[in-house]
UniProtKB/Swiss-Prot annotation:
An example Gene Ontology CC term for this record: extracellular region
Cellular compartment(s): Secreted
UniProt name for this protein: Probable cutinase 3
GO terms for MF: cutinase activity
Top-level enzyme category: hydrolase
Function: Catalyzes the hydrolysis of complex carboxylic polyesters found in the cell wall of plants. Degrades cutin, a macromolecule that forms the structure of the plant cuticle.
Main location: secreted
EC numbers, comma separated: 3.1.1.74
Similarity-based family: Belongs to the cutinase family.
Biological process according to GO: carbohydrate catabolic process
UniProt xrefs under Pfam families: Cutinase
Active-site residues from the entry: S129, D184, H197
């Protein structure tokens, strides 16, 4: 319990230290272009980190979406955050999957929706912090047909990096890119939060390049 208190305190401190979102950024904290929009050539499904607002968060989800749209065309990419039962609460980080079953199911629902609503779309995905565990656990359990539609994944501050050896189990390793910032202890099988854990936005363009390269 003492460790949990330290984690909550660290997250609160870092959240206060993080730069305030601009108006444009605040407006992009959520994206539901798969659920509410037309089918597009590419669908990007993203799970935010613990305590982040909206369904895309602020740190790295929206900038990766923006980078994809700049590279492929805004009318070619649908960005969809994982919301619903995934509330990005802190405590599920301490479970064996580093998240909880309902959060994993919420991501799986989005992958299934992409297949049923937009059977011709190419799916790419990503997750940050707890969201990386959500995507990891969801993708590895997808049926073979749906998994084959997921062309690439980017994982930032991957909480299961050590446990899953820098990859998503039962998914092609060359279709996954893991980003672990120098000094981010989350990537090394701890839940110790440092300032490095807030830096992943700088990798958004590189992540988009990787996702595009796998289409």
């Amino acid at each position: 319990m003492h460790f949990r208190a330290l984690l909550v305190s660290a997250l609160a401190t870092l959240a206060m230290a993080a730069p305030a979102p601009t108006l444009e950024a605040r407006q992009s904290l959520s994206s539901n272009e798969l659920e509410n929009g037309p089918c597009r050539d590419v669908t990007f499904i993203f799970a935010r980190g613990s305590t982040e607002q909206g369904n895309m968060g602020f740190i790295v989800g929206p900038p990766t979406c923006t980078a994809l749209k700049l590279k492929l065309g805004s009318d070619k990419v649908a960005c969809q955050g994982v919301g619903g039962a995934y509330t990005a609460n802190l405590l599920p980080n301490f479970l064996s999957q580093n998240t909880d079953p309902k959060s994993i199911a919420a991501a799986t629902d989005m992958f299934q929706l992409a297949r049923t609503k937009c059977p011709n779309t190419k799916i790419v995905t990503g997750g940050y912090s707890q969201g990386s565990a959500v995507i990891d656990n969801s993708v590895k359990a997808l049926d073979d047909d749906l998994k084959s539609r997921v062309k690439a994944a980017v994982l930032f501050g991957f909480t299961r990096n050590v446990v899953d050896r820098g990859q998503i189990p039962n998914y092609p390793k060359d279709q996954v890119k893991v980003y672990c910032a120098v000094g981010d202890m989350v990537c090394y099988n701890t839940l110790i939060i440092t300032a490095a854990h807030l830096t992943y936005g700088i990798y958004a363009n590189d992540a988009a390049n990787f996702l595009v390269s796998k289409l």
